[in-house]
Amino acid sequence: MSIKSDRWIRRMSEQHGMIEPFEAGQVKQANGERIVSYGTSSYGYDVRCSREFKVFTNINSTIVDPKHFDPGSFVDIVGDECIIPPNSFALARTVEYFRIPRDTLVVCLGKSTYARCGIIVNVTPLEPEWEGHVTLEFSNTTPLPARIYANEGVAQMLFFQAAADDVCETSYRDRGGKYQGQTGVTLPRT
């Protein structure tokens, strides 16, 4: 697999709707203010976080169980920023909707601006033929509250394309993946 450049990302997004909405360059300012950048970079695409957040709280003193997850463990927030409590986490989603080609795998890495503040972004790979808004997980590893900004860059997507003779036999769509077509912040499913 080879990593794909800005030219490929631009072409696939503009001609095939791989990323919507799509920003062909890097946006570093909004309303005259500096922001955490988003848009196309040399070998990736920096995604934005939407205004919907789910902040984890343990008010029910429950055990976190991915097979029996309690939606009541989250507080819903809609706003231009989200404060994550110390040593806690929040879920959000990308502004962008993705349609991944069959010969492509996407890996997500957090942006250094957040990582240098102790805020880690986690996303599993976007598999071939998956589509939807990406659910983002932000971990606040610090002993202090941490702020996440909506509509600004939070993570970078790297696109890897298989050789023509090595495209997967079964895509995410083929196997009926449980997160196919997700919109909004999606909680764990089994």
UniProtKB/Swiss-Prot annotation:
CDD domains, sorted: trimeric_dUTPase (cd07557)
Keywords: Hydrolase, Nucleotide metabolism, Nucleotide-binding
Residues that, per the record, bind dCTP: 111-116, 135-137, 156, 172, 182
SUPFAM superfamilies named in the record: dUTPase-like
Gene3D superfamilies the record matches: 2.70.40.10
Enzyme Commission no: 3.5.4.13
Record-level GO BP terms: dUMP biosynthetic process; dUTP biosynthetic process; nucleobase-containing small molecule interconversion
Top-level taxonomic group: Bacteria
Tagged with keyword Nucleotide-binding: yes
An example molecular function term from Gene Ontology annotations: nucleotide binding
Top enzyme category: hydrolase
Biological pathway: Pyrimidine metabolism; dUMP biosynthesis; dUMP from dCTP (dUTP route): step 1/2
InterPro entries named among the record's database cross-references: dCTP_deaminase, dUTPase-like_sf, dUTPase_trimeric
Active site residues per record: 137 (proton donor/acceptor)
Catalyzed reactions: dCTP + H2O + H(+) = dUTP + NH4(+)
Keyword Nucleotide-binding: yes
Annotated PANTHER family: DCTP DEAMINASE
Function according to Swiss-Prot or TrEMBL: Catalyzes the deamination of dCTP to dUTP.
NCBIfam families per record: dCTP_deam
Family per record: Belongs to the dCTP deaminase family.
Subunit structure as annotated in this protein's UniProt entry: Homotrimer.
Protein name per the record: dCTP deaminase
Organism: Stenotrophomonas maltophilia (strain R551-3)
